[in-house]
Structure formats: C-alpha cells, structure tokens
Amino acid sequence: MEFVMKQALGGATKDMGKMLGGDEEKDPDAAKKEEERQEALRQAEEERKAKYAKMEAEREVMRQGIRDKYGIKKKEEREAEAQAAMEANSEGSLTRPKKAIPPGCGDEPEEEDESILDTVIKYLPGPLQDMFKK
C-alpha cells in the first residue's frame, strides 16, 4: 500500500512545500539573467527610437523639398507672420487689434450689381433691351 501511495503522489510531495509558500529554489544566475534581459530590452528600445528618429528626419527632408518646390510655408511660419502683421498694425492703436482679413475678401469692385443687371438685359429680346437701356 505504501508503494502505491508513493507512486501516486510521486513528485507531488516535493512540490507541496512550494505550493504552501515554502522556500523556492533560487537560481544563482537568476539575477544575472534578469539583468541581461533588462539590458537587451533597453538596447532594443534605443534601437527602435533611433530608427524612428531617422525615419522622421527623412520624412521631414522630403516634406521640406516639397515645400520648397511648391512655395509652401510651414504652418508655424504662417502663424508667426500673421501674428507679426497684427502686432505691427496695432502698435499705434489704442483699441484691440482687428483680425486679419483673408486675401481676396473685399477686393471685388462694386460693379457687381450693374453686371448682374446687364447680364439679365442681354437675354431679353431686342425691343425690351432698348427699353431698359433708356
């Protein structure tokens, strides 16, 4: 009977102490292995960051080439120029600075009303055109 019990429990009796919170076997090289693993992780992270920085630098060079080719300014440069223009306009003013008017707004002449009327008159028959022109 003892033999059967030993065979059934076998190595479980050795592990019982560990399961109940007993002392675990400590690997003498565990600290060294953990340190090496941490170093490898740190090194991999540094390599990843360096690769990312290199790719970003290449992208920025490409973006700058496109900006130069098409005469596009960076967003920061445009904002700085707009801010400087607003500050320059408001130096002698006692009121708050006005918002900059976008280019193209208000540049049209006041001939729009007449041009619309002229356009409508063009589509009228000849005698009616003469009436409206007088």
Curated annotation (Swiss-Prot):
It comes from the Eukaryota. One of its GO terms (biological process) is regulation of exocytic insertion of neurotransmitter receptor to postsynaptic membrane. It comes from Rattus norvegicus. Nervous system. Strongly expressed in brain, where it is predominant in neurons from cerebral cortex and thalamus (at protein level). Positively regulates a late step in exocytosis of various cytoplasmic vesicles, such as synaptic vesicles and other secretory vesicles. Organizes the SNAREs into a cross-linked zigzag topology that, when interposed between the vesicle and plasma membranes, is incompatible with fusion, thereby preventing SNAREs from releasing neurotransmitters until an action potential arrives at the synapse. Also involved in glucose-induced secretion of insulin by pancreatic beta-cells. Essential for motor behavior. Disulfide bonds: none annotated. Its main location: cytoplasm. Keywords: Cell projection, Coiled coil, Cytoplasm, Exocytosis, Neurotransmitter transport, Synapse, Transport. It holds the Pfam family Synaphin. This is Complexin-1. Residues 15-60 have a biased composition (Basic and acidic residues). Residues 1-60, 74-114 are annotated as: Disordered. Belongs to the complexin/synaphin family. It is found in: Cytoplasm, Cytosol; Presynapse; Perikaryon. GO terms for molecular function: lipid binding; SNARE binding; syntaxin-1 binding. Gene3D superfamilies: Single Helix bin. Residues 29-64 form a coiled coil. Binds to the SNARE core complex containing SNAP25, VAMP2 and STX1A.
